Amino acid sequence: MANSASSRKRARQAVKRNKHNSQIRAKVRTFIKKVTYALEAGNKEQAQNCFTIMQKMLDQAVNKGLIHKNQAARKKSRLNSQIKAL
């Protein structure tokens, strides 16, 4: 348990940031799933639309330090190659 006022404030801020960051990560995962489901259904247009949104969200997550830049690049590259293969 936090004792000083500053440590209590830090604990509150950590909870708030954790909630916000987990929401952003969940949105990114949701759009990755949307692209994957569109690929499985063979719907190239929907996959392409979701992919552009997903790219933007991944880049924002990288800039905020939630996802490593190499991980984001890997996800974008693999999904883009699957879209091109359709």
From Swiss-Prot:
In the record, what terms sit under GO molecular function? small ribosomal subunit rRNA binding; structural constituent of ribosome
Query: Could you provide one GO biological process annotation from this protein's UniProt record?
Result: translation
Q: What does the UniProt keyword field contain? A: Ribonucleoprotein, Ribosomal protein, RNA-binding, rRNA-binding
Segments of this protein annotated with the region Disordered: 1-25
InterPro entries assigned:
Ribosomal_bS20, Ribosomal_bS20_sf
Q: Does the keyword RNA-binding apply?
A: yes
One Gene Ontology cellular component annotation held by this UniProt entry: small ribosomal subunit
* Cross-referenced Pfam families: Ribosomal_S20p (PF01649)
UniProt family annotation = Belongs to the bacterial ribosomal protein bS20 family.
**UniProt cross-references to NCBIfam families, sorted A to Z:** S20 (TIGR00029)
Q: What is this protein called?
A: Small ribosomal subunit protein bS20
Q: Which lineage is the organism of this entry classified under, starting from the top rank?
A: Bacteria, Pseudomonadati, Pseudomonadota, Gammaproteobacteria, Candidatus Pseudothioglobaceae
